[in-house]
């Protein structure tokens, strides 16, 4: 059995570009709609499925204010502080920073961010 995360967003082309930039991901599979959005797009990092993205079938209501999500994507063992900082800068642009970059009780360098698509990320070294 396998499990993989998928997000549904308004603005799937922009979201794919942003996640590729934030995490060094590559598009490994894609199906576009007649409206030039993604019906389904799979991103890989180091040859492993990282995230799937699809255009939301209706206009998503994204509250960009400080809202606690009931689900988060935890991306850890990113290798360097520079990798974490890059992801933080990309994801926080237009999003909401919950916890700024720095140490916490269980990690030396991490942050919590809700990106401009309403997706909650915990990123860490």
What is the predicted role of each segment?
Residues 1-31, 37-99, 112-125:
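Glyoxalase I/VOC metalloenzyme domain signal
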């Amino acid at each position: 059995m396998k499990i993989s995360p998928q997000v549904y967003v308004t603005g799937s082309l922009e979201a794919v570009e942003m996640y590729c930039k934030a995490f060094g991901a590559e598009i490994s599979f894609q199906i576009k709609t007649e409206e030039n959005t993604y019906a389904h797009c799979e991103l890989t990092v180091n040859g492993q499925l990282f995230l799937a993205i699809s255009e939301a079938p209706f206009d998503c209501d994204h509250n960009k204010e400080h809202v606690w999500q009931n689900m988060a994507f935890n991306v850890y063992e990113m290798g360097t502080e520079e990798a974490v900082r890059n992801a933080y800068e990309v994801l926080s642009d237009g999003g909401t920073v919950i916890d700024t970059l720095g140490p916490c009780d269980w990690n030396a360098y991490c942050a919590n961010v809700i990106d401009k698509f309403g997706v909650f990320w915990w990123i860490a070294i």
